[in-house]
């Protein structure tokens, strides 16, 4: 089997596990939601707390903690005819300093699938294990009056049957108001916009290049203290992928969250996406002092889709 053909098959298997290869979309490690909390709310991850580096770095200015750490794992259902189970694993830390500044670092790994190679006669040869990983950095700056801006960068390593290295970056801005009221109830509001995964194509050799999944994302989140110990929240976000230019995809998701005593939360939502990317979402979480534990399940809406679950652990202080 020619190397170029092996690369294409490995690419399809790795990306197909997340259904992120809709109409040619690539490198799902740069676009998959790593946050279990917002995954349960229709994957409305643009304006969110927790997993700041990969959601919204500016959101850290809305909390009274200086240091944050998160880790998560997403496990996807097995693909028919492919060995192994696809997983996305993430760890990130962030630090707020000098009132207006915050810095972040993180790491992501995606892999777990096995592909059997064959020669021109159809005889089995070596086994291929495609995977991706990234090292990520971010910086956020509080401009003032609730406005802030941020930028993140990614060092990317991708292995299909050949290796490719590259980089990408994201720029965004947000507004948040933690002192507003709605019907005499204390409320928090946040809106965020960004252009993400900007960068050159990854070159795997043998004539195969993968475009970055460059996209625009806009979203907002609102939470209201309905009564003593009772809080209700809502989130909505949309993403439009315009790269590769021949593989445009539109995704919109939203969800609701109920929290009791600022400790126990239940969540539900729906995510609509072109080309079999839609999901019903649900989950729950527990928060005690600075510790956060969340879980989510994304249920595919059609057989051609892919269901998956995400669990996350975080700590702020």
Give, region by region, the residue ranges found by the protein language model.
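Sec-dependent N-terminal signal peptides
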Residues: 5-14
